[in-house]
Amino acid sequence: MNTRMEHDTMGEIAVPADHHWGAQTQRSLENFQIGGQRQPREIITAFAWLKEACALANADCGKLTAEQAGAIAAVCREIRAGKWDEEFPLVVWQTGSGTQTNMNVNEVIAHLAADRGVQLHPNDHVNASQSSNDTFPSALHIAAALSITEQVLPTAERLAAAFRKLEEGYPDLIRIGRTHLQDATPLKFAQEVSGWRELVEAPCRMLRAALPELQKLAIGGTAVGTGLNAPEGYDEMVCRRLREMTGADFTPDENKFHALTSKDALVFAHGALKALAANLMKIANDIRWEASGPRCGMGELRIPENEPGSSIMPGKVNPTQCEAVTMAAVQVMGNDAAIGFAASQGNFQLNVFLPVSAYNFQLSARLLTDVMDSFRVHCVEGITPDAEKMTANLNNSLMLVTCLTPKIGYEAAAACAKKALHDGTTLREAVLALGYLTGPEFDETVRPEKMV
């Protein structure tokens, strides 16, 4: 491998000649050969937004020339476009402040600018008015906020729309309800599906409620929150540039001491992701139970047959999309535990669990985004109810007896249900045998369409 020599304050080190990072990135590569989980691309993209905004703000206050700021901005745009993804090889398991990733970005920007004739120092120019201690927390928040608004919410809205279409397609179909895994009173199939839709829409409102705190940035706090070496008003200048570039409402955190040491906004936002995961698991479980069969299960729903389900049982088709949803949900719940514990470790002036927090948040956002689209396309949009099976189960249910309570009383109604169950007869036959109602009276009283 061809190398070139780079130096930092610790001396010289050989760096691959065909890459654009510098000495500090190389030291991190050699010192932290752990796991293999690289910094999420969303974090690198967020850094590229942040570094461009910082460069333009530094030019505004005279700390960089227009040429220097322009060179930084040009490279940042290419990084966001994915042109230099291979230049960001560092793993999550590094320093807890994310310093090495910050320097990785600084070094790559400086080297690429130099290739174009603009000499920049990674620290003095690209990192001017900044510290890893305020840039990584800011990039973390930028990435989280944009992942919510650009990925999770649009995907969730598409899934909710698919449920609304299913809901509107069967306005009059009545089915038996179930509570405690036992038969309950009837409801419309559309009403059940409306519940599934709201299970997607409610966490979306929670995510939107989390955005204002998540959009508060630590930038301008520098090392410990005092703003040392940052010009006055620098935080607002950076955030103004970010607002212009991204369209998101990023603002300076008014208390930088809080911003550097706390990750409560991330915990709150991820809590909404966990709520979405929990609701998706409930929906997936409902659907796969109701689609169980084809002959010996509930069989009230038909779901798409996407692939063979068994290597030994010919013709078997499984609810694979539902299973993928439930596994993704479990992972998100595990990620939530990691983020919560990491947030509790903000000792003194800095939280040093930032990379693992960023990794888990982005993993959750990506999993939920991908699994919701997959679930929608390969399952939800192909769901059809088995109206015949639903109606048969409805008519066979003893819980229709509930509508008799106002007419014959709770205890008499219970006696009718127990007799029908014990004798293996219909509810109508039991009521007539006990003499509580005549046939016409029963038929007039027990009408499922009036119970929903």
Map each language-model feature to its residues.
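Conserved, well-structured ligand/cofactor-binding cores
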Residues: M1-V452
